[in-house]
Amino acid sequence: MRFNAAITGALVSSATLMGQAHAEETEKKADATSLVEKPTFTPTTIEAPFLEQFTADWDSRWTPSHAKKEDSKSEEDWAYVGEWAVEEPTVLNGMVGDKGLVVKNVAAHHAISAKFPKKIDNKGKTLVVQYEVKPQNSLVCGGAYMKLLQENKKLHAEEFSNATPYVIMFGPDKCGATNKVHFIFRHKNPKTGEYEEKHMTAPPAARTTKLTTLYTLIVKPDQSFQILIDGEAVKNGTLLEDFAPPVNPEKEIDDPKDKKPADWVDEAKIPDPEAKKPDDWDEDAPYEIVDEEATMPEDWLEDEPTSIPDPEAEKPEDWDDEEDGDWIPPTVPNPKCNEVSGCGPWTPPMKKNPAYKGKWTAPLIDNPAYKGIWKPRKIPNPAYFEDKTPSNFEPMGAVGFEIWTMQNDILFDNIYIGHSIEDAEKLRKETFDLKHPVEVALEEASKPKLEEKAATPSVSFKEAPVTYVREKVDYFVGLAKQDPINAVKQVPEVAGGLGALLLTMILVIVGAVGASSPAPAAAAKKGKEAASAAKEKASEAVSSAADTAKGAATKRNTRSSAQ
């Protein structure tokens, strides 16, 4: 048992030293956000049909719209009153000097556009559309998608609206249960000349956090497309197979003039005409019958009514028997019935009738006259056409954001529209790949840390030792569930105390099993006494180590303030 005491003493000393070391470590910690090193924005040298980083001359390219939104479902006029600004992020800013286009108003219609230096013709080429979205207040209900507008010499930026013809719509949209990344393109029917929107099926979910998200769309001349989020592919498909309605109509359609013959038999099954109802089939037998074997419970009070006059009720003072009639007190449930199985006349319960069979019907058999499900004959589709290259989008002359959102401060940046996958990746490495890790670090640093919780018990050890120890242990267990190593660092006194207790119990068990003393009862008694003593020392270790650590920290703080 002297060995156990020595071990316990050593652990207590270790816990004290660990507590002092931890106090010093906590004292040295600085604000995590100040330790995050941010890169500085440098304009790219990449050239593209359209590349926007919202540098100082951005307003020479972008024009807010002052048009009115067209809405056939409402008589009210909606103007694009939402304001725009170019500024650095105010939330999780991951790059010094990096400005973006920011939505400034909540619950407002916003529209802004920029013309391309020259129209973008994608015939026979790869189209790459890439841009950053940073919802600084998260994205709960609103759009953050862009539109590539159809080339039109008559297009005036100030008149840009939801009615302005676009070629491609791409980007995130979130509201309620809707959460997706749009990819829609308008396709012209070569026979009728009419345009039809083709919507990508099974769209991926949008990212709605306050971090910058990079959305990339790649459409290749082989009609395949790919959507990437933060540089990772989230959707692959083809323009000919993954859009609704499909680009090309069916070659054949149902003949609208074809009619089902009058003698066509649609019934696959019919009642068996040779089947007969069994002689013992009783259709009149009831579904339930009285349970003749049931007996009245012994505590059933047949003479007690289920309700009685309310003994606490009193006749109103203004009650006139001549005018109002005899006053009858209201009734209340008989309290005696609550204590027994029931009151009043007893009737036996019902039970399912074993002889019940219900109405007899003949079993079904295959209909020998069945001809199958009738379908009209097929005829060639007069509106059929085949467009094998829908990626040859119509020429595009501008890019615009035409959105409505309940959140402001949505930031757009680093827009690339061109034909080079390599250049888009290079731009990503120059911008997103540098700022995004910083934003993640800033977000992590801004989260409340576990050690920020009430690590100090609500009472002192002298006031309530049991409560003090329990709160310390609970705090240690909560930390250990997420990070055991951090738990030992944060509450070393509890770790040391629990370790001492565990080691003592192991030694007691080993000693009890391997003891060869002729007096086992005495040995067991000594073991229990030793275990009890160890527990007391472990509790003392928790309090003394904590007090030692607190004292050390207090002394150091005092010296710091004095300096």
Swiss-Prot record:
Residues 515-563 are cytoplasmic. Keywords: Chaperone, Disulfide bond, Endoplasmic reticulum, Glycoprotein, Lectin, Membrane, Metal-binding, Repeat, Signal, Transmembrane, Transmembrane helix. An alpha-D-glucoside binds at residues 145, 147, 166, 173, 402. The lineage of its organism: Eukaryota, Fungi, Dikarya, Ascomycota, Pezizomycotina. Belongs to the calreticulin family. It comes from the Eukaryota. One of its GO terms (molecular function) is calcium ion binding. Residues 241-323, 521-563 are annotated as: Disordered. Residues 249-279, 526-539 have a biased composition (Basic and acidic residues). Residues 1-23 form the signal peptide. This is Calnexin homolog.
